Amino acid sequence: MHLVYIAIFGALGCLSRFMVSGWVYALIGRALPYGTLAVNVIGSLLLGLLMEGGLRSAALPADIRMGITTGFMGGFTTFSTFSYETVRLLEDGSMVAAGANILLNVTVSVVFAGLGIFLARQL
């Protein structure tokens, strides 16, 4: 059953990523891959909150927990797109933009995962 829940939640995560990313690009533009940055940062915050705030010890069945963490969060965040977009920036000669993309995705995502854990501990 794990696979069924992971697939269902994964599909929802992918659709959510598509919608959030598109909204961010429409709002801010495409000077940098802001849509990918947004989903990675939001996903890091949510996973920190969820893991520290109750999914580990919640009375949720293991299938649902796997669906949320591996499925939804895995479908929502995207390391492969971040990597691809960074390579494209490098190929285009946009070294500063590529460096900024790496720095922002890694640093801000890690900070927001920590923030999620911190916030969950305050609840």
Swiss-Prot record:
The keyword Transport applies. Na(+) is not transported, but it plays an essential structural role and its presence is essential for fluoride channel function. It comes from the Bacteria. GO terms for cellular component: plasma membrane. GO terms for biological process: cellular detoxification of fluoride. Na(+) binds at G74, T77. The keyword Transport applies. GO terms for molecular function: fluoride channel activity; metal ion binding. InterPro entries: FluC (IPR003691). This is Fluoride-specific ion channel FluC. It comes from Syntrophotalea carbinolica (strain DSM 2380 / NBRC 103641 / GraBd1) (Pelobacter carbinolicus).
